[in-house]
């Protein structure tokens, strides 16, 4: 990561009045769709053709009744700890096709593990000219590969963060394009184990699809790629670490401010400002946000939170991002946890992610 060359001038100032106007365009709704059982679509360049079925997104294939009928021969994701289901005479009626019920797995109406293709034609808004344009997939499962028209954009396979693709060089504002997404839910590089609650058919299920937000979004050419806040109670401040990305050298200024929420006590943190000069690519920026003498702390009894507002101004473009955080100190001493100096017992429940109707947790 390239180090930021900073002209440090941290001053207390008023909040900038200019706000970043990031745009978004929902791609929810009807998509063209096709199952690729033999995994031949990439070789045959299915991104160049029209797919032969349709599906509504966001959603999973089982939820939309796409895939194979469940039979006693279905290959499940998960260990079979009791195989008597397959030969016990008492269970015979539950092995009949069309009446299949399993005693230890959820039994969806449809099941599929493999590759499926999703395709949609869209026109990029003409007023997005000069902006960075991204495809945001909040929760695909598991691996995605994206094409715009015939250009491959890339592949991502994270199970814990959204898949985000930069389409700027592949699309033209005001003109139509075809977005094709190949989704593969086979267990490959991302192998959390066949009995992991996130994929096993005993609980959540190993589904193919895309859920949550599916959007085209814009950012300025200079933008916040990541913002992390580290509270420092002993010094009454928060350290804010930012990754600022740019397609070229740039300069400007960042303003940070914060206000309390999730509490009856109102506390506005005075803004601080810092100028920057960056290179193309990733640039690390660090700023300190003094919280004042009367800052609110977070714990289970008084869960006060803060909403950090970060404003980035670079020439004619600006961006605004918000991140929530709590002022709390968490330590381990011996066998005990301490939150803000108070000995704390942490309790929890075992949640197996059982969502038989959809295969995934609610995304709202």
Regions found by a protein language model. Name each.
Residues 25-27, 34-38, 67, 78, ...:
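Accessory beta-strand-rich segments of carbohydrate-active enzymes
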Residues 309-364:
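N-terminal carbohydrate-binding accessory modules
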Residues 178-181, 302-314:
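Short, aromatic- and glycine-rich surface loops/edge beta-strands on solvent-exposed regions
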Residues 165-170, 287-303:
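Signal that preferentially marks extracellular ectodomain short beta-strand elements
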Residues 218-249:
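Surface beta-strand/loop "capping" patches
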Residues 1-22:
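Bacterial Sec-dependent N-terminal signal peptides
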Residues 146-148, 237-276, 285:
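Beta-strand-rich binding/interaction modules
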Residues 175, 278-290:
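Glycine-centered tight-turn motifs at strand-turn-strand junctions
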């Amino acid at each position: 990561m390239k180090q930021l060359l900073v002209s440090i001038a941290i001053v207390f100032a008023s909040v900038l009045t200019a706000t970043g106007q990031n745009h978004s365009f929902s791609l929810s709704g009807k998509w063209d769709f096709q199952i690729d059982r033999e995994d031949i679509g990439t070789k045959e360049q299915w991104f160049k053709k029209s797919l032969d079925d349709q599906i509504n997104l966001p959603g999973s294939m089982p939820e939309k009744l796409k895939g194979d009928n469940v039979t006693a021969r279905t290959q499940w994701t998960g260990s079979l700890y009791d195989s008597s289901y397959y030969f016990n005479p008492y269970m015979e009626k539950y092995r009949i096709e069309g009446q299949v019920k399993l005693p230890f797995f959820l039994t969806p109406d449809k099941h599929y593990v493999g590759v499926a293709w999703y395709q949609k034609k869209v026109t990029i808004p003409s007023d997005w000219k000069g902006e960075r344009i991204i495809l945001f997939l909040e929760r695909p499962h598991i691996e995605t590969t994206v094409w715009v028209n015939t250009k491959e954009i890339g592949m991502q396979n994270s199970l814990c963060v959204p898949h985000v693709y930069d389409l700027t060089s592949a699309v033209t504002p005001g003109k139509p394009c075809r977005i094709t997404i190949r989704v593969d839910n086979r267990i490959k590089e991302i192998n959390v184990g066949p009995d992991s609650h996130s994929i096993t058919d005993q609980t959540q299920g190993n589904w193919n699809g895309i859920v949550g937000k599916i959007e085209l979004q814009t950012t300025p050419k200079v933008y916040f790629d990541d913002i992390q806040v580290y509270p420092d109670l002993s010094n009454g401040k928060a350290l804010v670490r930012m990754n600022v990305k740019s397609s070229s050298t740039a300069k400007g200024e960042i303003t940070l401010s914060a206000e309390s929420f999730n509490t009856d006590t109102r506390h506005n943190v005075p803004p601080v400002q810092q100028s920057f000069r960056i290179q193309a690519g990733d640039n690390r920026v660090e700023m300190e946000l003094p919280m004042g003498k009367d800052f609110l702390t977070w714990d289970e009894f008084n869960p006060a939170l803060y909403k950090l507002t970060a404003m980035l101004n670079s020439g004619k473009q600006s961006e605004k991002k918000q991140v929530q955080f709590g002022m709390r100190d968490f330590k381990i001493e011996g066998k005990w946890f301490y939150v803000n100096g108070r000995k704390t017992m942490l309790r929890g429940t075992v949640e197996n992610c059982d969502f038989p109707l959809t295969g995934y947790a609610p995304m709202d």
